[in-house]
Amino acid sequence: MLKTDFNQPKGSTIGVLRDGRTIQQTFDKMRYADTIQELRTMEPVGPRDVATVRRATEDSVLVNAPVYYDKNDTTSPDDGISVFVTAGGARWKFNTFKGYCAGLAGLKEDGSNVTTVVNGIVNRIVAKMVAAGRVNNQQRTVNIPVTGDAPEWKLTGPLVWPTVISLVFHGSVLLDGTSLTAGKILNCNNVPFMDRLTVAIMAAGTNPTDRPGRVNQAVGRAALTCIGGEVTVRLPGTQMDGSNNPTIHTVGAMIGNDAACLLDARDIYFEKFNIIGAKTGIEFGCYNTFMCGVEHFNVSRCYDGFSSPTLGSNYGERMYLRNGTIGNMDRHGAYLVGGGDFTLENVSVDFLGGDLAHFGPLSPAEYKHLSGHIEGVKGSLAAKEMPASYSKALVILGKAVRRDDRVVDQNDYRGVRQLFACPQNPYGRMLKVINESYAPGREGQVPNNPYPCETGWPGNSGVELILPKDTFVDTPYVNSYSPAVRNSVNQTISFTTASTGPLGGNVLSTDYAFAAEIIGGATCSYGTPAEATSDGYMPFIITLSDPSDVVYLFCTNRFRPGSGQSVLWGNCSVTLVGTTGSIILAPVIASYLGTTWTANTTTGAVTATPIRRGIQEGGTVDMSALAAAGGIPNGTYQAMPSRSVQGFYLGCDHAVAGFKITGGTGQVRLKLPVWWFR
């Protein structure tokens, strides 16, 4: 309220508080302490006395922290962060309703003691939890004020705190840990506190009164965040040895329990942070750690982006990475030795020396990249080491994932190559991949790989690759050469040494899997083991004596198209030996509709002969031009880019697929012919 003071010039007013004191009188009563040491020498003068502490120490950050006298408290110990006891036994208290202040605990302006101060506050908070016998309803936030222009603070060791405490930086800061060669630098982990915190303390106050025996543990939520900026941790890198192995072993951010621990790490997340130069950017705990993640993050110049490093227990449910980048890894984007269900949304991956997702031999982990960008992966998009159990790993690349399959430089090869890997093993297909991503950048790329298949050579049979029909925006390729999961219309893709000499000419025969129809002086015969390459597959040997020669190589496995609009795709692996001119390949379909019945009046036998209605030819490929453009020498196999064919007869009884080879002279060696519908 305001009142007129008649002792002052006319019209003057002064403020009056509810207790009758004027504002000036209140200002006159305000007390200041330059340091906490000075505060401890100030005795309260009244039951509602307040004071302001400018700094914790002479060289600490300016905080101007308000404290109040609590006349009812005569027992609380001086904790150095929120309770300060005078010589006369009075308790000055800092109101912690917004959390504890690292500045009031002595954080220096240059941040050189940030490790000591933050870990000290954490230990005092834990002591309060232990004294109270509970985590719930305890203040668990540590506010860390950042001052100055472009602050760069020196870390003297890791920051370590349990998952029920939150670190909140106020302002952007660079935490320089380049002198640290080991350890988990941002270590949100319950294991170091198991000697003090117990399940009973974590669970106190969480259970309904009618079920006192049930255990619900406290959760932490925002374990690391930044208001008004971001936190950057810079570490010394990996410093590879002569065998290309890292000599420095740091983890940028540890989220969860890294050893056996009954204290839950649940529902916690890091946000607004960068990790630069660690061996592992982010490690997720493998013991009682679940529903944890990171948001608005960047991991750069590390050995591995993030990891699940061991097979623990009760962990990995609904882990997530959102709105971030994993870039310039020496090795893998995700290194998953343990389990866990990891979902990536709006995450970009730029340049990896190894694999996008790499699984250990026992890993049952799930890697689900639902949206974002993938670029520059030198290794596989997904790879699993030789499986040692029935532990199937799962990878899902979503429709909103755009890939650029180049490796490093702008002009790098981005065409078809092996993208998924799991070796043949006693347990079956232990890497399952559902790939809905798209890679328009590889259109028009000349193949420099022998196998037109994203699972690579036929021996890579531990992969089950599923390519949903409605997701392609670029040329599709066959999903696998493995007969157990291949989506082709022909189950037979090769022949054995029992097949020798020229191929038979009866496309309707069921005695053999392949047949050839020849126009002109060409020949088509089975290859021999001596003509096989290291994969063991023998080729068909096609010799053209004149550019007008035509060879139709058919697989006699019959199929029936689903509709007249179905598009059949085909590809194979080809090498040219001593050819001239342009060797042209195209997929074809021979359609059969109706039957001619022939009766033998002598024997009474009746023969049924399907009527061929025509051969439809699909898109062509000039393999000679392709080999020249790709620098592929004679005798080296090259993938035929997939081409489609359409136009078979509606309602046809059956069809057979094949390739047409024509256009030049010389020898064409063709192996692994495959045809499939999307």
Swiss-Prot record:
Keyword Signal: no
Alphabetical UniProt keywords: Degradation of host capsule during virus entry, Degradation of host cell envelope components during virus entry, Host-virus interaction, Viral attachment to host adhesion receptor, Viral attachment to host cell, Viral tail protein, Virion, Virus entry into host cell
Translocase among keywords: no
GO (cellular component) term, any one: virus tail
GO biological process: adhesion receptor-mediated virion attachment to host cell; symbiont entry into host cell via disruption of host cell envelope; symbiont entry into host cell via disruption of host cell glycocalyx
Subcellular location as annotated: Virion
The organism's place on the tree of life at top rank: Viruses
Subunit structure: Homotrimer. Interacts (via N-terminus) with depolymerase 1 (via N-terminus); this interaction probably gives rise to a branched tailspike.
Stated family: In the N-terminal section; belongs to the Przondovirus depolymerase 2 family.
Function recorded in the entry: Functions as a receptor binding protein (RBP) and probably mediates the attachment to the host capsular exopolysaccharides. Displays a depolymerase activity that specifically degrades the K56-type polysaccharides of Klebsiella pneumoniae capsule, which allows the phage to reach the host cell membrane and bind the entry receptor.
Name the UniProt record assigns to this protein: Depolymerase 2, capsule K56-specific
